[in-house]
Amino acid sequence: MSGHSKWKQIKHKKEITDKKRSQNFSKLLKAIKVAAKGNPNPEFNPRLRSAIDKAKEFQVPQDNIERAVEQSGEKDLEEVTIEAYGPSGSALIIEAVTDNTNRTINEIKNILKNMGAKFAEPGSVRWSFELSARDAGWTPKFKQELNESDSEKLNQLIEALEEHDDVQKIYTNA
């Protein structure tokens, strides 16, 4: 009967939930640190205001948000945009925030290779997206149709990329 107690089941579910929550917190706090570099006052920095609002939406504690704004000048974080091709030529734009660009790019290249996707040269995917002014995200100019198996492969690829600590957002045209 090992592993069948109610507490073991609750503990297992809680571990999974806490891990996802922790990953979300670290990604949101990195976004705040990068946004606060321009101006640490959210009244004059709309990007920071947006990042703080999103963090509050995910119930990040106020202490953590304030600490991230204070630390914005300490660590040298930079934004990286990576372009890739997924199953059936679907286009991907991966945005990441990192303190070591080479490490992050190599780790993402490795994930792409292991999942059967291809790293693309800068600009080779971006042409098929538009940068929207509202939420500063990428919207595809056209949709790529995928069959069921390729759609499943793309979902697995996106999940693998989202597990990477430095990856902030992933945009696809599928």
Q: How would you describe each model-predicted region?
A:
Residues 1-139, 174:
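N-terminal cationic and glycine-rich segments that engage phosphates or anionic surfaces
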